[in-house]
From Swiss-Prot:
Keywords, alphabetical: Ribonucleoprotein, Ribosomal protein, RNA-binding, rRNA-binding
Pfam families xrefs: Ribosomal_S18
InterPro entries on file: Ribosomal_bS18 (IPR001648), Ribosomal_bS18_CS (IPR018275), Ribosomal_bS18_sf (IPR036870)
The keyword rRNA-binding is annotated on this UniProt entry: yes
Function: Binds as a heterodimer with protein bS6 to the central domain of the 16S rRNA, where it helps stabilize the platform of the 30S subunit.
Domain of life: Bacteria
Subunit structure: Part of the 30S ribosomal subunit. Forms a tight heterodimer with protein bS6.
PROSITE patterns: RIBOSOMAL_S18
PANTHER family tied to this protein: 30S RIBOSOMAL PROTEIN S18, SMALL RIBOSOMAL SUBUNIT PROTEIN BS18M
Entry similarity comment: Belongs to the bacterial ribosomal protein bS18 family.
Gene Ontology BP terms: translation
GO cellular component term of the entry, any: cytosolic small ribosomal subunit
Name of protein: Small ribosomal subunit protein bS18
Length: 74
């Protein structure tokens, strides 16, 4: 028998003890769409606190011109 709706424990892509820093641009780019939008938590798999910290870091990096607000390549 299969149990529908059971997914098991989700593993966060970033270890919980690691700090999310606005200077780690390569890490932040993994959580942004091609158009520059921040991916939602249900897609990233982060914890609630990590998602909040990620959002703050991305917004801070945008203000310091490390990341673009909108990617207009396409």
């Amino acid at each position: 028998m299969t149990s529908f709706g059971y997914r098991g424990k989700r593993v966060s892509p970033i270890p919980p003890k690691d700090k999310i820093d606005y200077k780690e641009v390569d890490l932040l780019r993994k959580f942004i769409t091609e158009r520059g939008k921040i991916l939602p938590r249900r897609i990233t798999g982060l914890t609630a606190k990590q998602q909040r910290d990620l959002t703050v870091a991305i917004k801070r990096a945008r203000l310091l011109a490390l990341l673009p607000f909108v990617n207009q390549e396409g």
